[in-house]
From Swiss-Prot:
Mutagenesis or variant effect for D362A: Unable to catalyze the cis-dihydroxylation of naphthalene, biphenyl and phenanthrene
GO biological process, one term: catabolic process
Swiss-Prot/TrEMBL site (Important for enantioselectivity) positions: F352
Effect the entry attributes to changing N201A: Unable to catalyze the cis-dihydroxylation of biphenyl
Effect of S12F: In strain: ATCC 17484
UniProt effect for mutating D122E: In strain: G7
Similarity comment text for this entry: Belongs to the bacterial ring-hydroxylating dioxygenase alpha subunit family.
Top-rank EC class of the record's enzyme: oxidoreductase
Effect of K32R: In strain: G7
Pfam families associated with the record: Rieske, Ring_hydroxyl_A
Role summary: Component of the naphthalene dioxygenase (NDO) multicomponent enzyme system which catalyzes the incorporation of both atoms of molecular oxygen into naphthalene to form cis-(1R,2S)-dihydroxy-1,2-dihydronaphthalene. The alpha subunit has a catalytic role in the holoenzyme. Also able to catalyze the cis-dihydroxylation of biphenyl and phenanthrene.
Record protein name field: Naphthalene 1,2-dioxygenase system, large oxygenase component
Length: 449
């Protein structure tokens, strides 16, 4: 199929063909145009603090080794031996000066260089050029306040530019709070859903919370419990949504610092966050200080999502068009007491981990929506994301990005899928940029409802 001319997402991101969640040929195309081109989350500084520390991570369907170098920098390499293609490292994390393949014993340094070959002189003589046989390196590795992302494409914009307007909303928690830590290793589970189904859910779907999560809201007694069973809408002014040029976006629920954590944690969390308010008001202003203590449900395009004040951090690793491996970490503020960090991490796994009750609520929705995307009659139907269209603004005096000033809407859906369509119909970054030259105008139209 020629995706340069295939319209999978309508103008302004108002709808998507259902087949985007179930078509295997399209999935293979995504590996080239989405996962080989965009910035993908790898790890966090706190998980590889010392030289020689490494973790394995996924970039699309490929696995990489992410290693702290002797000079403190971080590099990433395909986890594939250059001799006969065997997986080089079979564990999730460790510390090593190098990596030795268990097939024929070829040894690579933590810098990716081929350092040793058994019986090299006897078997190869002078014919083996080890300098050309190092591990394939991920072209770009950059950090957003300790969160490490990698990109295979040299032409990609710098990570900070790629995050764009979304960074303004993330930095109060990621930077100005004093910094974050990632608690690993991640909980892992495989779901029978396309990777985009959970990514779109986290990018800004507050609409489903009261209904899908009714029992979880009631049993957890979180600050959002009043929404259970669609008993009420969030009041006017309770939040907003935003999206950005490269597809990253989020919803903001004001003053939701204790997130989905149960009632026993709420007083301690609210006191901890509240203690930083005076300093943050002075450093970054009242609005961004309020964003720090507000609940953000966010997706960094394409497949990294988070619920900031709930401490949930996700990577949706694709396996095929209808299968995704979900990695769930906890994020905690660096200066939290160690006991509070531990209890928050436990709460994350209890709510959104592999067996979490909030997670279980979502999975059936995501799985059946994805599986229906490959069925004959439903695959060409349109999935709607038009809620709030015509009310979004760009160039607001306070809030950057394309903004929908309501807690419930689909602003960030439209931005996510506008970027998605631009990528799958482009051959490179230059073509994507051309297709995105009027991105905010397209998303803020007031016609074509």
């Amino acid at each position: 199929m020629n995706y340069n001319n295939k319209i999978l997402v309508s103008e302004s991101g108002l709808s998507q063909k259902h087949l985007i969640h179930g078509d295997e040929e399209l999935f293979q195309h995504e590996l080239k145009t989405i996962f080989a081109r965009n910035w993908l989350f790898l790890t966090h500084d706190s998980l590889i603090p010392a030289p020689g520390d490494y973790v394995t991570a996924k970039m699309g369907i490929d696995e990489v080794i992410v290693s702290r170098q002797n000079d403190g920098s971080i590099r990433a390499f395909l986890n594939v031996c250059r001799h006969r293609g065997k997986t080089l490292v079979s564990v999730e994390a460790g510390n090593a000066k190098g990596f030795v393949c268990s097939y024929h014993g070829w040894g690579f340094g933590s810098n990716g260089e081929l350092q040793s070959v058994p019986f090299e002189k006897d078997l190869y003589g002078e014919s083996l050029n080890k300098k050309c046989l190092g591990l394939k390196e991920v072209a770009r590795v950059e950090s957003f306040h300790g969160f490490i992302y990698g990109c295979f494409d040299q032409e990609a914009p710098p990570l900070m530019d790629y995050l764009g307007d979304a960074a303004w909303y993330l930095e109060p928690m990621f930077k100005h709070s004093g910094g974050l830590e990632l608690v690993g290793p991640p909980g892992k589970v495989v779901i029978k859903a396309n990777w985009k189904a959970p990514a779109e859910n986290f990018v800004g779907d507050a609409y489903h919370v009261g209904w899908t999560h009714a029992s979880s809201l009631r049993s957890g007694e979180s600050i959002f419990s009043s929404l259970a069973g669609n008993a009420a809408l969030p009041p006017e002014g309770a939040g907003l949504q935003m999206t950005s040029k490269y597809g990253s976006g989020m919803g903001v629920l004001w003053d939701g610092y204790s997130g989905v954590h149960s009632a026993d944690l709420v007083p301690e969390l609210m006191a901890f966050g509240g203690a930083k308010q005076e300093r943050l008001n002075k450093e970054i202003g009242d609005v961004r200080a309020r964003i720090y203590r507000s609940h953000l449900n966010c997706t960094v395009f394409p497949n990294n999502s988070m619920l900031t004040c709930s401490g949930v951090f996700k990577v949706w690793n694709p396996i095929d068009a209808n299968t995704t491996e979900v990695w769930t970490y906890a994020i905690v503020e660096k200066d939290m007491p160690e006991d509070l960090k531990r209890r928050l991490a436990d709460s994350v796994q209890r709510t959104f981990g592999p067996a979490g009750f909030w997670e279980s609520d979502d999975n059936d929705n995501m799985e059946t929506a994805s599986q229906n995307g490959k069925k004959y009659q439903s695959r060409d139907s349109d999935l709607l994301s038009n809620l709030g269209f015509g009310e979004d603004v760009y160039g607001d005096a306070v809030y950057p990005g394309v903004v929908g000033k309501s807690a419930i809407g689909e602003t960030s859906y439209r931005g996510f899928y506008r970027a998605y369509q631009a990528h799958v119909s482009s051959s490179n970054w230059a073509e994507f940029e051309h297709a995105s030259s009027t991105w905010h105008t397209e998303l803020t139209k007031t016609t074509d409802r």
